From Swiss-Prot:
One of its GO terms (cellular component) is cell periphery. Its main location: cytoplasm. The gene is CSS3. Disruption phenotype: Leads to elevated levels of Ty1 retrotransposition and Ty1 cDNA. This is Secreted protein CSS3. Disulfide bonds: none annotated.
Amino acid sequence: MVPLFGLFCIFSQLYSLCSAYVDITSGYQVFFNLPTNMTNNQICWLFQASYYDIYSDKSGRTLRTGRFEPGDQQSLIYRDTLVELEAITDSYEYSNLDLSTYNGPEPYNSETDYCTDIMDLVMRVYDEEGHYVHPVANNSTNACAHPTPPTLNNLLISNYSDGRNYKESSI
């Protein structure tokens, strides 16, 4: 008789081979228009420091950075489809945002974990195959507002170095 743990391991290996899920290990897999060489913690902070621009894009895919110097304002745009980290190439669309020009109430602090609270929101905007399906928030000006009820809430997020929702990557 095969122990239950052994069966679980076999089924989980088979499942991972057949799964269409994308393992999110970097914000670069989720957003266009990010500055080069940001850590995931910085990406998560930037997400929180941004707001939905419902006047120019009612799909909910576009967020604008807030409280930066005029030359450093930009948009974060959800990808149509999540991509594997290996698929991101030199042709990726980067911007040149300077985080030091932010003049909002809570500037970036490297000691703070900005990712724990937002990954559930990111999970809710993509379906199981990694396709964008709906906006995170309805008519919200805050990127961290309560999300719309999810249609699919089981995007696989795994392999985190600290047991939390996101891990730092080398990008």
